[in-house]
Structures are given as structure tokens and as C-alpha cells.
Curated annotation (Swiss-Prot):
Pfam families: LAGLIDADG_1. PANTHER family: INTRON-ENCODED ENDONUCLEASE AI3-RELATED. It is found in: Mitochondrion. It comes from Dictyostelium discoideum. GO terms for biological process: intron homing. The gene is aI3. Its main location: mitochondrion. Its EC number is 3.1.-.-. This is Probable intron-encoded endonuclease aI3. Mitochondrial DNA endonuclease involved in intron homing.
Amino acid sequence: MKVEEREYIKKYWVGLMDGVGSIEVNHYRMKNLQYRLVLNVNDSSENMAMLLKIQQVIGGYLIKRKEKALIAWTINNKMQIEDVIKIFEDYNLVTVRKRNQLQFLKENLKRNDVNWYLSERKNKYKKSLIVSNIEEISYFNEWFSGFVEATGSFCIRAQKEKYFRIAHRYDMPLLLNLIIKFNITTKLREQKNEQYAIEIYKKTLLEVLITHFEKYPLLGDKKNSLETFKTR
């Protein structure tokens, strides 16, 4: 695999992690700390191919969760995690929630103290972090494609009305920044359980997004969704 493709996959993976990833710290019988990075995606041949590329570049292993129709990519080896999270030094996580998870994991790696973990785990989302300015993110395009793979939908209604949707929990400021970035005219929709959504119907904006994904391709099953969306 060429260097350019490897770097693309790293940036794309960061977007996936921001969208549907989890950075976890747990304990084993109150004695030892356990660490895990995980991505869960729908079980499809396209998503399997995408995760195999991620495995080739970043490491980890894949598990099929047939009862939930999911494929999980995960790393739970402490030494491997310490190596993999160095990627976030080059390509920072963007969502506040994932950055809080990463900060909590790093602090536990440093302390290796079950008592500290037990006392602080309820506070891991309470630290105030500055909202990322997406205009300053040099890898935004690749990150955005990964984020859309995780959170985006290409929708076609019965009347053949087409629209694009991003839905994400917790990080309302990020979605507001995306509205500004793409000059989206529709308002942010607030739903249950701190879920927020952007819907784009305007043809010129949909064309901008299609052009983006032609240059920065989707790697999983959203690629097929996009092709169907384009031809209807």
C-alpha cells in the first residue's frame, strides 16, 4: 500500500472514530485496568473491506457480531494502544466527547491506578475542552469522509426527493460548524437523547458534497449508497 493511501486511511479512521468509535477504560475485578479502542459498523462486504484496510494500516482485529449484524474492529492490547493513539497526535480527534475519552485513557495509562479510575470515571466528560475549529484542520476533507461513513445517510423518498443527512449525538457545536462550512441553509434539528441532525435538500449543495466524495472517496457501504443516490 502506498504512503498516500496509508495516510488517507489514518485520517479517514479518525473521522470514523469521531463518528461511531469508542475509547474505553475498564477494570478487571477491581485489580487491573483494561483498555480498548473499538469501531462497530454494519455487517456488509463493503464495510468488511474497509475494516480490513484499517487493520492493515493501524492493526487490531475484527469480530463479526452476528446477533447484532455488526462487524467490530478493536484493539485491546495495552502496548498496541499506546502506539496507535500516537496517530491522534498527527490527526487530532475533532469531537469533544472522543477527545475527553482519549484524555481519560491517557491519564489512566500514565497513572495505572484502579482507585483513581474508579473515583474519576464519572467525571471524564466534565472537563471543558475547546471546540475544534474545522477551518484549521488540515486533514478535514479525509476526516469528513470518514465521519460521513459513520454518521451520514443518502436518502431518497418515494417521490424521488433526495436529501443528505448527518445525525450525531452530543457534539452540537461541531454540526453547527459544518452548517457554516458548507453554507447549509436548513437549521440544525434537535432530537431526543442529545441527538442532532443536519438535512440538505438544496441541489447545488448536494452537488458540492458529491464532488467532495469523488475526490475523497467513501470506503465502506456508504459508497454504494452514494452511487445509488447519484443515479436516481
